[in-house]
Structures are given as C-alpha cells and as structure tokens.
C-alpha cells in the first residue's frame, strides 16, 4: 500500500481478478469509500462491508461473478490522473469510455462522481480513473 490510494484500489481489484479471488480487502479512507460507493452503485462490485482490525478500518469488496460461469466478471480499470501528472478537464472534455458504456470517476468541487453526473451538473475536475 503506497500513498496513491486510487492506484491501490485498482491494483488490488485487478490482482484479485487475475488470481480468481472473490473478495478484496483495501484500506478505508474517505476517498476510497467514495470511489467504492460509485463502483457499487454502477454494478462493478457486488457488495461492500467495513471491517475493523487492530484500530485500522478496512473495506472488504465482493467482486461481481458471471451468472453462467464460475469466474469473476472481468472489468478494465485504469488510472488516469496520478500524483506525478494530474489530469484536469472541464465537463465538455471528459471522455466517453466505450461510447458511454464505461465510466470515468471524476473528483469535483462537489465531491467524487461519475462522468455522467459531472456532465449533467456542468462541472469538471480531476479525472481519477476509468472503468469499463
């Protein structure tokens, strides 16, 4: 776990998918909780629960499974803005991922939201990551 909590979330989920694990445990911060709420609301993860262990809070994510096969549902997660190179955009410049099928998570002055919500409210911000 490094100082880039968004990259830690993405890496943990990606590693769990490749190892065919059903759950992921990540450190709980305000930023990670907001990003995980968006992932849960958009259907990219199945369940979230808070876990406290030795005075540290963790989030336990249950990854979404395919209905027909036993495998984990594969999602593509990529970090856009990073600590060394921040990427900002106004609401018109936020990209549409796969023609609107995927989502971009944007950190705005009104909180963390999806690209659709940012476009509807007419506000831009820092593009954190995209999921498709």
Swiss-Prot record:
**Where would you find the membrane-spanning parts of this chain?**
none
User: SUPFAM superfamilies annotated for this entry?
Assistant: Ribosomal protein S8
- Keywords carried by this UniProt record: Chloroplast, Plastid, Ribonucleoprotein, Ribosomal protein, RNA-binding, rRNA-binding
Q: Which Gene3D superfamilies match?
A: 3.30.1370.30, 3.30.1490.10
Query: What subcellular locations does the record give?
Result: Plastid, Chloroplast
Q: Keyword rRNA-binding: yes or no?
A: yes
Mind telling me which GO cellular component terms the entry cites? Answer: chloroplast; ribonucleoprotein complex; ribosome
InterPro entries linked:
Ribosomal_uS8, Ribosomal_uS8_CS, Ribosomal_uS8_sf
| UniProt subunit comment | Part of the 30S ribosomal subunit.
Q: What is this protein called?
A: Small ribosomal subunit protein uS8c
Where does this protein come from, organism-wise? Answer: Acorus calamus
